[in-house]
Amino acid sequence: HDITEDIEFGDLPGLKKFKVEVQGFQEIYNLACPTAPKDYAKFPVKTAVANSVGVVNSLEWAKKYKARYLLTSTSAVYGKPPENGEPVKENYYGLLDFLGPRAGYNEGKRFAETLVTTYQDAYQLNTSIARIFSTYGPRMLQHSGRQVPDFIRNAVDNKEIEIAGDEQSVLTFCYVKDAVEGLIALMASEISDPINIGSEQALTMTEVAKKVIEITNSSSTLSYTNKYAYTMQPAIPDISKAKEELNWFPLVSIDEGLKSAAEFYKSTAFLRRP
């Protein structure tokens, strides 16, 4: 279902056995938004609408069924990170280009957070906001502009690995299983303020690409490009709040996570053959 369109859950045949109109929903996780880098150029309007109309629709469902609501926001709401590379806490506010090619996503997520807190105050909704930092793992879409799946695909095929940025470009990587456990912990809590979900370990993209080459036993070489206008230097999260209030922190190492993602890609290669 398109989240930007309203829906009557009781009219869906697949949900009739759940008796939604009687039992309702207890929890709503809103993860519905284009997030791959190339989507910013391909679906700019849909991205902005998902972060506005789509969020309103899902909040109305939470209001109707008195469900606890969790919005998955993004590290992009922090805008330009501190120049000294210091990890950002939830109260950090950086400059953000609200008219740039990523505005439908970056500024859209800021507006989505505003909608959530406004509904919370106006209708006493039970809400929470997770600011997700870079996440990776198996089943990620190929050719989406995301670095890890692109690295793995090219490494397996022994093709050149193209890095968006230079040799010093850094990013943090949180394995999907860890991120999901963070969301579940947040939903089970009574926290309503935004909270960072991500890894504190910053790695250069060069380091990650070399790890992928080693894991896949590839002969790929590296190159660097700045052609992606929709990319920006991301912030590094301070997750002390998640550690203290959710007892959550990432457990899967980057080597273990990359190995899992690479193994999945290789095991499903036959599905992508023409």
Can you annotate each of these PLM segments?
Residues 1-133:
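N-terminal Rossmann-like NAD(P)+-binding domain of SDR-like oxidoreductases, especially those catalyzing
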Residues 3, 8, 93, 137, ...:
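Residues that form or immediately flank small-molecule/cofactor binding pockets and catalytic motifs
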Residues 10-13, 39-42, 53, 83, ...:
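Generic recognition of short, well-ordered alpha-helical segments
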Residues 17, 29, 36, 44, ...:
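Generic anion/oxyanion-binding catalytic loop in active/binding sites
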Residues 23, 53-56, 110, 114, ...:
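Short, contiguous clusters of charged residues that form electrostatic/catalytic patches at enzyme active sites
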Residues 82-91, 104, 114-171, 176-187, ...:
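NAD(P)-dependent short-chain dehydrogenase/reductase
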Residues 155-274:
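C-terminal substrate-binding subdomain of Rossmann-fold SDR/epimerase-dehydratase oxidoreductases
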